Each structure stands twice: as structure tokens, then as C-alpha cells.
């Protein structure tokens, strides 16, 4: 399993090699930003969350406003108190595939010196069970003030993404794309032949 601290370390190494910048927010900074979704999911963990910001901004960028990529960084997902069956938990170390995709994209854009202003955001935690873990019927507050009543602790991806999407608004982005392993229902629909997509911009 890839711990979020190790993920951030790898990102910093890649940033040095390929030329993008990286900033890692610790728990104190996340609390200051009032990221209740990320903090709520992290309550059951014995290690703190991180929030990672990757930036590729060349001087010749063709876009003044950034393209923002948001990746779900749940490093291991037990489902929390809405516990997954054991056979569904086997591959949950890959629940950070969205985070990996965002980091890989930033790396590729920087390595190829593409003239695009791109920001990557990765909220990172795991979703575990403990005496402190969040439970069904808890009310949490996202960083933009939106309140959420928890009905299933295994819907944690939406919560961490909500804080990241709220954070992205400050950049006035040209386009936002989030990437996440959110539901097995998507695989039931597409199998291995595609991905489930939704959006509000037909021209994107």
C-alpha cells in the first residue's frame, strides 16, 4: 500500500526531475482551510491526510487560466463503518488511481514541455475503521460551506473530491477534470471497454 507521505515524496522527486512545482499541505494547513470532507474521511486513520498541489506553468502557456486536474487519493479504502465485504477489499490499494493519473499527466506535460498551464490537486487519505471514524448520520462541512449528511461511509471519494473542487475555484480555471474510482457500477456498465464520464461542457 502506498502511504500518502510516500506519494508526496515521489511527487517531489518527479517535480525535481521533470520541472513542475509541488506543494504539500499537512493536517494543520488542511484544518486551516476547513476541508471537512478530507478531514472527515481521515478520522478513522492513524496517519494524517495530505493535500497535494502540482503546477506546470510555462512562460509560453497558451492558456491564461489553468486546466485543473483533480484526482481521488484514497490510498486504501475499507469502506469505513459501511464496511466492504472482504472479497471487495482486495484491490482497494488502487483506490488512488485518480491521484496516480493526475500526477502522471502533470509529469508527462512537464517532461514534454507542453505550452499549457496545468494544475493538479490530490487530496490524500485512507478510509479505515476506528473508534474515531466518521459514521452514518454524521454531518460534515466542506471547505466552501456545503454541509453533507453521511448516509454511507463508503462514498468517501465524493467527500475528498468536494474539498479539492472547492479549492480549485480560486484559480478561475478554464476547465476542471476530476478522475476517480468512485463506484463499481461504472465497471458493471462499461466492463474493460471504457470509462463512465459525466460533464457540463459539451465542447470540452
PLM regions and their residue ranges:
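A generic structural signal for tightly packed, nonpolar segments enriched in small/aliphatic residues
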Residues: 7-204
Amino acid at each position: 500500500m502506498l502511504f500518502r507521505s510516500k506519494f508526496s515524496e515521489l511527487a517531489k522527486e518527479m517535480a525535481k526531475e521533470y520541472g513542475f512545482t509541488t506543494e504539500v499541505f499537512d493536517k494543520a494547513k488542511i484544518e486551516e482551510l476547513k476541508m471537512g470532507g478530507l478531514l472527515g474521511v481521515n478520522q478513522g486513520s492513524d496517519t494524517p491526510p495530505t493535500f497535494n498541489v502540482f503546477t506546470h506553468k510555462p512562460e509560453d502557456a497558451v492558456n491564461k487560466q489553468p486546466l485543473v486536474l483533480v484526482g481521488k487519493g484514497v490510498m486504501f479504502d475499507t469502506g469505513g463503518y459501511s464496511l466492504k465485504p472482504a472479497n471487495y477489499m482486495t484491490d482497494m490499494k488502487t483506490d488512488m488511481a485518480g491521484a496516480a493519473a493526475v500526477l502522471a499527466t502533470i509529469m508527462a506535460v512537464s517532461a514534454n514541455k507542453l505550452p499549457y498551464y496545468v494544475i493538479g490537486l490530490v487530496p490524500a487519505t485512507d478510509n479505515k475503521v476506528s473508534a474515531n471514524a466518521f459514521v452514518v448520520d454524521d454531518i460534515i462541512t466542506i471547505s466552501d460551506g456545503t454541509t453533507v449528511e453521511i448516509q454511507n461511509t463508503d462514498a468517501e471519494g465524493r467527500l475528498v473530491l468536494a474539498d479539492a473542487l472547492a479549492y480549485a475555484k480560486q484559480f478561475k480555471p478554464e476547465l476542471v477534470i476530476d478522475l476517480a474510482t468512485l463506484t463499481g457500477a461504472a465497471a458493471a456498465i462499461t466492463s474493460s471497454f471504457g470509462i463512465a464520464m459525466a460533464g457540463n461542457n459539451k465542447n470540452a
